[in-house]
Amino acid sequence: MTNSNRIKLTWISFFSYALTGALVIVTGMVMGDIANYFQLPVSSMSNTFTFLNAGILISIFLNAWLMEIVPLKTQLRFGFVLMVAAVAGLMVSHSIALFSVSMFVLGLVSGITMSIGTFLITHMYEGRQRGARLLFTDSFFSMAGMIFPMVAAVLLARSIEWYWVYACIGLVYVAIFVLTFGCEFPVLGKKAEQSTQPVAKEKWGIGVLFLSVAALCYILGQLGFISWVPEYAKGLGMSLNDAGKLVSDFWMSYMFGMWAFSFILRFFDLQRILTVLAGLATVLMYLFINGAPEHMAWFILTLGFFSSAIYTSIITLGSLQTKVASPKLVNFVLTCGTIGTMLTFVVTGPIVAHSGPLAALQTANGLYAVVFVMCLILGFVTRHRQHNTVAASH
């Protein structure tokens, strides 16, 4: 593989994460305007965004098999057609049914693209370099999550219709589409086996189970925590602005943490540093929940920084459980994380209704503790060290 080809594939991975981040995080900014557009209450409007999450979940799950049947380049180019159709559907839709279908299609495109982006990084880079690259790729999710809400705010403040926000997000996919030209993609499935020596099928091992549970609990814990921080802070007497600032501080610190750890991770054993970070994050969340209100900003800043590398490290360790990075394995761990996203309000909603926001934060803290335990147990069964040694000797 030429260096210029590797750079193009890496940028496709970066943009794939940016696309998903933009679609998921911009939801809160546009929901009110969309509800007014369809003359519906915001509460019922929020349910239609489940179609976006469902599309992401289904496509990540199915793409583990699709990757071996449909070439990656074909998938990305067909995704461009679907993206244009979905944005056009949003622009002309005056029925909630067409809006829901368009959201589902956006989710499908986003999930397929992100699973391809994740696989490309795990395929092109080995060992510790893989973890660092995947972490830097994941930072584009947060970066898009910071940029596109600002774009949405500017457009909506000028009374420009909400669907132009999605047209702007579509420009990210235009960049992916352009990069597919003159770019060679890895060949998977039967065609790959004909051109190379047959690869013996590897068993995943019990470590993948621990990592999958960790991925689900981490995302469910993180989103369950950050979704209810504003309500919890307001309950302590904070203003709406101060409560919102806690959330923005968390994501800002999270992004800086990703950049820092993309360099730091190269010098440590991935399972050991993951266990330390999961333990630190659990303690910091406990201190945030039980500490004095004047210290909350510091605790959430440090929590954002030290928890930023956890999810990507889980995915990277998953990919290192086999000698050759398996798209099915990577997608399985990703799917478990996405299930955590889907369950966020299913799990925390009833808890808040019954016991208040504090109980939701304590539940999230318990889930982080489960992540720590899973990472600790993983140390006894992980295969990444023997595969790293093999990779280093080649």
Curated annotation (Swiss-Prot):
Keywords: Cell inner membrane, Cell membrane, Membrane, Transmembrane, Transmembrane helix. InterPro entries: MFS (IPR011701), MFS_dom (IPR020846), MFS_trans_sf (IPR036259), MFS_TsgA (IPR023528), MFS_TsgA-like (IPR050375). PROSITE patterns: MFS. Pfam families: MFS_1. GO terms for molecular function: transmembrane transporter activity. GO terms for cellular component: plasma membrane. The keyword Ion transport does not apply. The chain crosses the membrane at residues 11-31, 51-71, 78-98, 101-121, 134-154, 162-182, 206-226, 250-270, 273-293, 297-317, 332-352, 361-381. It is found in: Cell inner membrane. It is a multi-pass membrane protein. Belongs to the major facilitator superfamily. TsgA family. PANTHER family: L-FUCOSE-PROTON SYMPORTER (PTHR43702), PROTEIN TSGA (PTHR43702:SF3). HAMAP family: MFS_TsgA. This is Protein TsgA homolog. The gene is tsgA.
